[in-house]
Amino acid sequence: MNFTLHIWRQECAHAKGHFETYQIDNISPDCSFLEMLDILNEQLITRSTPNSQLSTLNSPITHPVCFDNDCREGICGMCGLYINGRPHGNDDGITTCQLHMRKFKDGDEIWIEPWRAKAFPVIRDLVVDRSALDKIIQAGGYISTTTGGVPDANTIPIPKQDADMAMDAASCIGCGACVAACKNASAMLFVGAKVSHLALLPQGKVEAAERAKKMVCKMDELGFGSCTNTYACEAECPKLIKRQNISRLNRQWIEALLGRDSK
């Protein structure tokens, strides 16, 4: 398969970015998207050789394309590319590393950009600084407990419905696709998931109201936008986190402001 790639290149957060165009050929339909970028980078490194398959249409930058990745199994949340106007590309419920080239047509033009958000400054090319999400977790995304022996798993009975909802919320991998998809660059789905997976369980209910208040305040402080209920975040989330977590966060936030315990 042959593709024309339009890739965002930017030296740092303060530099002016631009698209560069590459023609890449003979890509297997079974390649993942990141493997295709690996092949591109190999050819960028060796493009001066006579047998290079890479055609560079406008390329003042010679270093390989920088992009985040780690596990390449859809678990770590490191990979995050805006592909043809969609976070993680043109499929549902997957991360970028799980996107395969067979989802495209031979000869397609593919536009590849980093996450766009004030809270996610560009480090280089397609790599952005998502440490703002970690700072939100540090503000309150935990439970306070006394260290010591580990209690038995069945010490505190938990209804299956609550356990299932908590598990669904806990599947958030913190990739930032919800922020990238949102026209306001809001992190409400991320914060809602992190608040919900603790508040739904007995161990997390004690600090539920204070947790919601701290995490929302930190989110606003870091420059994320407000939620206007378009739910693009839910549509693009690779782990299919539901918007009900946003509703639960709003409810706990209001209860915290009123000084009431979250239910």
Could you describe each region identified by the protein language model?
Residues 75, 81-83, 233:
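Functionalized membrane-embedded alpha-helices
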